[in-house]
């Protein structure tokens, strides 16, 4: 059992009451939001899934028996509780790396190495390197490569075959691993985030019940005090075609704005919240491991490795620009959402093949799953999510525990 799994259960208060935000001198801000159709591939689904005699929630038996990777199937334990995540310093492994990539692209592997740009500015596809063979120095260079390219797709990997314990330990090289507030994880591996879209026509139809698109652009758990750095994701089972993942570059999006707008945006801060995600889980009969959190982050953050500015807003978890009135905030946020989501010339489409691992820089890119297959085929994937630094608008605040404006409390 991992250290995180062994933490003492902590009783947490209900959060079904309205949220009041206290912002260290800023006005109290009240807000409401609806979050699309919910996370049906990460949350327990009452009526589809099962409850064991011990109270453990799990995927139904008929799906478990057909799984090619049963060790990665999600479970949800209603007794598993954690306190709030605490601040910790983060030292990006990319800052330790050899910029010549002499370990990652070792001379002895050059003959079998195939590297292809996915787009001129964003993304690489690599064949001929096994992630499981990398030394610690090569992993540092991997972090640097992902920061520089935004998204790196590795083909023909044995990564998932090594099992949940191995991939969890692998992820720890890149930072303290995040434990999700509601999603399923393999038993005894709480740091793995599992997505499992069930092969059920009704569930597929639910995606489009209230929307004309399956798109759900976001950056992972931006509501946390210290959101992730390098996200590792692998689809272990899925459709033969479709189910791709879209990525958009928020550095490029920021660079395309006019200088006056760039300067104005760089003075603003945004509320990010997990409240709606937790409510979605509970509506579906699922769990809540921690009390929902709300944090304020700069609208424009500086990437600690690239020293470049990124737009740090996303439709899933951003709620309001602190300094603006509600209507002003909604108009500006929608403009920025649409800029990132609709500018296809700053995006790429990662196609899933068996034994692929995609690694992306969660600070730089947004992503969205594409649900476009029609047959009732399940899509099963796992994610490793190392936490990064607290987002800052100036690197002089990097790893400063007293940096404001992220700190706030929930009056619940």
Curated annotation (Swiss-Prot):
Superkingdom assignment: Eukaryota
Free-text remark on how the cofactor is bound: Binds 1 Fe(2+) ion per subunit.
Listed EC numbers: 1.14.11.-
Annotated pathway: Organosulfur degradation; alkanesulfonate degradation
A Pfam family recorded for this sequence: TauD
Enzyme class, spelled out: oxidoreductase
Binding site for Fe cation: 218, 220, 367
Cofactor: Fe(2+)
Annotated positions binding 2-oxoglutarate: 245, 352, 379, 383
Annotated SUPFAM superfamilies: Clavaminate synthase-like
Gene Ontology MF term list: metal ion binding; sulfonate dioxygenase activity
Alphabetized UniProt keyword annotations: Dioxygenase, Iron, Metal-binding, Oxidoreductase, Phosphoprotein
Entry's Gene Ontology BP terms: alkanesulfonate catabolic process; sulfur compound catabolic process
Residues recorded with modification Phosphoserine: 52
Any one GO cellular component localisation term in the record: cytoplasm
Annotated function: Acts as an alpha-ketoglutarate-dependent dioxygenase active on sulfonates. Although taurine is a poor substrate, a variety of other sulfonates are utilized, with the best natural substrates being isethionate and taurocholate.
Similarity comment text for this entry: Belongs to the TfdA dioxygenase family.
Protein name, as recorded: Alpha-ketoglutarate-dependent sulfonate dioxygenase
Gene that this polypeptide is encoded by: JLP1
